Amino acid sequence: MSWQAYVDTSLLGTGKIDRAAIVSRAGDSVWAASAGFNLSPQEIQGLAAGFQDPPSMFGTGIILAGQKYITIRAEGRSIYGKLQKEGIICVATKLCILVSHYPETTLPGEAAKITEALADYLVGVGY
C-alpha cells in the first residue's frame, strides 16, 4: 500500500478523521497528505523535534497547517493537541510521524484509537 493510500483509506476512510498526513520522522519531508492539509517545512521540523523532547511541546504547543493547538498529551511516541472542539493526534514510528486532524464531531479517543492502530501496524511491518 502506498503512503497516500494509508492516508486516504486507513485514516480519512474511517470518516472520523478529516485531514491527515504522514511525514518523515526526521522532519525533512511530507510523504503523503490529504488535499488542503499543507504542512510547512518549519512545522514538520518542529513536530519532529518535539518527539525528541515530548514535554517541551507543553510550552510551545503544536503548530500544523497554520493552526496552533494546545498540547494535551506528550509522552513516548504520542503527542496530542486540541483547538476548541477539534484536535490533532501525532504518533511517531521508527521512520515516520502520522498526523491526524479530527473535527468537533469526532471524539478525541476515536481519533487516537485509529491513528495509534495504524502506527502499531506500521511498527509491526518495520516502519
UniProtKB/Swiss-Prot annotation:
The keyword Cytoplasm applies. It holds the Pfam family Profilin. PROSITE patterns: PROFILIN. GO terms for biological process: actin cortical patch organization; actin filament polymerization; cytogamy; mitotic actomyosin contractile ring assembly. It is found in: Cytoplasm, Cytoskeleton. Its main location: cytoplasm. CDD domains: PROF (cd00148). Keywords: Actin-binding, Cytoplasm, Cytoskeleton. It comes from the Eukaryota. SUPFAM superfamilies: Profilin (actin-binding protein). InterPro entries: PFN, PFN_euk, PFN_sf, Profilin_CS. The keyword Cytoplasm applies. One of its GO terms (cellular component) is cell cortex. Binds to actin and affects the structure of the cytoskeleton. At high concentrations, profilin prevents the polymerization of actin, whereas it enhances it at low concentrations. By binding to PIP2, it inhibits the formation of IP3 and DG. In S.pombe, it is essential for cytokinesis. Occurs in many kinds of cells as a complex with monomeric actin in a 1:1 ratio. Belongs to the profilin family. This is Profilin. It comes from Schizosaccharomyces pombe (strain 972 / ATCC 24843) (Fission yeast).
